[in-house]
Amino acid sequence: MSTISEVGPWELGLSLGSGGPNSSRLAKHRETGQLAVVKPIVGWSELTSSQQARIEGELVLLRLIEHPNVLQLIDVISAQEQLFVVVEYMPGGELFDCMLRKGSFTEQDTAKFLWQILCGLEYCHKLHICHRDLKPENLYLDAHGSIKIGEFGMASIQQPGKLLQTSCGSPHYASPEIIMGRSYDGCASDIWSCGIIFFALLTGKLPFDDDNIRSLLLKVCQGQFEMPSNISPQAQHLLYRMLDVDSSTRITMEQIREHPFLSCFVHPNISIPIISAPIQPIDPLIVQHLSLVFRCSDDPMPLYEKLASQSPLVEKTLYTLLSRHLHPPSSAAVDRNRAVVDDLLGTAASNGQQMDEEEIEQAINIPTLAPYPISYAAESVPRPATSASPFLTPVTTSGTFNYSFNATNPQSILQRPATTSSAVPQLPKSVTPGLAYPHDSSMLSSNYRPPSALSPRNFNVSINDPEVQLSRRATSLDMSNDFRMNENDPSIVGNLAASNFPTGMGPPRKRVTSRMSEHTGNRVVSFPRGSAFNPRVTRFNVGNEQFSNNIDNNNYNQPYANATMNNSRRLRTPSGERSMRADLSQSPASYDSLNVPKHRRRQSLFSPSSTKKKLSGSPFQPKRSFLRRLFSSEPSCKCVYASLVASELEHEILEVLRRWQLLGIGIADIIYDSVSASISARIKRQNSLNLKPVRFRISVLAEFFGSQAVFVLESGSSTTFDHLATEFQLIFEDKGFLDNLELSYFQASASRPVSRMSVSSSPFAVFRQRQSVQS
């Protein structure tokens, strides 16, 4: 391909890979100037008919899916006994490389990425297309930082009411049901993979990881992972629901769309045709292409029968979408539409009015087939004879096919070699040379090497290999600046001129890999080149950075729609303190019943904090004594989560305190403050349980899954306070309204530095037993 300067209407330019014959080339349309990437399939005529059919089936899927968050297939051209696939140009490269450079992302950026992935994936699921190989290596960034899903080599059509059988994907991202070899729901498995990506974006590492593949698979099947304590409760809850081992109880796409962590985003309204009437007449050419997708090329009669039936079937939907591409509007119809547009524009101009594109489309009633111009649309430049048919007639030869991912299913023509066909070792690849587009270093490359077992799996650790730094030509993809590339930039277009296209790949430019950063104001500044690399994870939250117009930075810590920040809290355990700000607005009523699987451990919200700054305005921040202020000692604090709403939880706490007061435990001075929604009381020195005196406060806060009671020690014995808070937790558990997330945490939590008496030896045990007998 190095001697080819053009393919059809596309002028070839820089090589995006290693420079070999299988490397992708940056291309520009001769007349429209559109940028694209041309990927060759060398030896196409030497493939068997079944191998060609599988590759063509993937191309049909790519052509069917038209969504802003899915990589766009532009054209397929045959020239010089080769097949050239023209796909969308993605200046941002892979999300994987961006994660290697940046490490972890803020919750705001993570939510934006996750929402875009889910939007594209939901559109595929509506077409009954399951991706089955979602991972950061298969997600790409455009010039504006938007994510697009690519690599549909393992995608499959899942008929309604049926399950998939083939085990495929990468073990780090594959769902437990795929690893265990069971029949599975492809949509639920894709949601699991999105949960792994969600975790990696937030933390910079994978939730399930091990050098031993057997241990890794066991971890995935058990679903046990360490939940980071420095993320919001909403993010934790969504992670638990997405990484549910039981696919039948795993959160669905509809529930994810309504989850508070993502409720601030507006769901795009992209319609999909649902057809019940029989297709008449049936085009044999379209059926031939659909038979590649449904893998029934040998016997297409069942496909004809379904198209002629009276039921709304997925075959009819895909037939309708494919017919729009194979049979675009005639030139006469296009000319009539253009005449109507000119007439409308002339009338509007005479009246001193201006019409936008949406008004024009509504006036002439022209359906929009694609979100942006593509070469096979009616208004595009006609293709030459070499690309008149998007697919070729299968040719049976005796050639070899050395890039199949198993014995029956060859890999994607656009797919990276890191993907495996089943749960076998597949580690994230190292940094690849070139611009890391979705088309370089494919499985067609002759110099492909298996993934190394030492490939990095922690995205927070930068790669310090000098050879890797010299081989990478992509510029640093900092989230604040590098998504500003414009395809219409004169400097870019000038470099892509046909006369300036180099015949080979020039010397690689020196790449500066990202290092651990230091935070200065609202910018992230890299250390000098000579500084030593620090492998420790460091997180910085740029509070004033505006990443998306759809997100309100002032309200995003609690991502509800129209949420407002009105409260803050500081929590601490005897092992250290943790500062945490959270919005305490009322949550949707539908989330009172959301539960988290009991077998997972809830990480403590009280891990040590890197800041000592006080959070003003907290409704339950007590006064500190002179010694506490002198030694910067914070009071003990503990949270108990309940499924009740805040008002009901307040009533239950007051009822327990008053009952204890009647039993003679020594409870006194019970005061309810309706302004701060807190209850204060104390245990007197003279009490029937010989407890040390203590003064405490209980603040009730609304959460999206119910409410929480925050117990704060104001003065007195921390041991008595610990018994008191634990007793409330046990009472809530006995009454059945302790939140499952909190229940699993208390059951699995390790011993704390402060000694805690057992439940049976607790001073409150006798009264709890008496209350159980009475109830």
UniProtKB/Swiss-Prot annotation:
Residues 10-262 form the Protein kinase domain. ATP binds at L16, G17, S18, G19, G20, P21, N22, S23, S24, K39. Residues 584-593 have a biased composition (Polar residues). Autophosphorylated. GO terms for cellular component: Cdr2 medial cortical node complex; cytoplasm; medial cortex; medial cortical node; mitotic spindle pole body; nucleus. GO terms for molecular function: ATP binding; protein serine kinase activity; protein serine/threonine kinase activity; protein-membrane adaptor activity; signaling adaptor activity. The keyword Magnesium does not apply. Pfam families: Fungal_KA1, Pkinase, UBA_Crd2. Keywords: ATP-binding, Cell cycle, Cell division, Kinase, Mitosis, Nucleotide-binding, Phosphoprotein, Serine/threonine-protein kinase, Transferase. Its EC number is 2.7.11.1. CDD domains: Kcc4p_like_C, STKc_BRSK1_2. Residues 549-563 have a biased composition (Low complexity). InterPro entries: Fungal_KA1_dom, KA1_sf_fungal, Kinase-like_dom_sf, Prot_kinase_dom, Ser/Thr_kinase_AS, UBA_Crd2. Coiled coil: none annotated. GO terms for biological process: cell division; cellular response to glucose starvation; mitotic G2 cell size control checkpoint signaling; positive regulation of G2/M transition of mitotic cell cycle; positive regulation of protein localization to medial cortical node; regulation of cell cycle; regulation of cell size; regulation of extent of cell growth. Residues 549-620 are annotated as: Disordered. The modification Phosphoserine is found at S309, S311, S476, S587, S632. It catalyses: L-seryl-[protein] + ATP = O-phospho-L-seryl-[protein] + ADP + H(+); L-threonyl-[protein] + ATP = O-phospho-L-threonyl-[protein] + ADP + H(+). PANTHER family: MAP/MICROTUBULE AFFINITY-REGULATING KINASE (PTHR24346), NON-SPECIFIC SERINE_THREONINE PROTEIN KINASE (PTHR24346:SF76). Interacts with blt1 and mid1. Acts as a mitotic inducer. In G2 it negatively regulates wee1, a mitotic inhibitor. Also has a role in cytokinesis where it required for proper septum formation. This is Mitosis inducer protein kinase cdr2. It comes from Schizosaccharomyces pombe (strain 972 / ATCC 24843). The lineage of its organism: Eukaryota, Fungi, Dikarya, Ascomycota, Taphrinomycotina. The gene is cdr2.
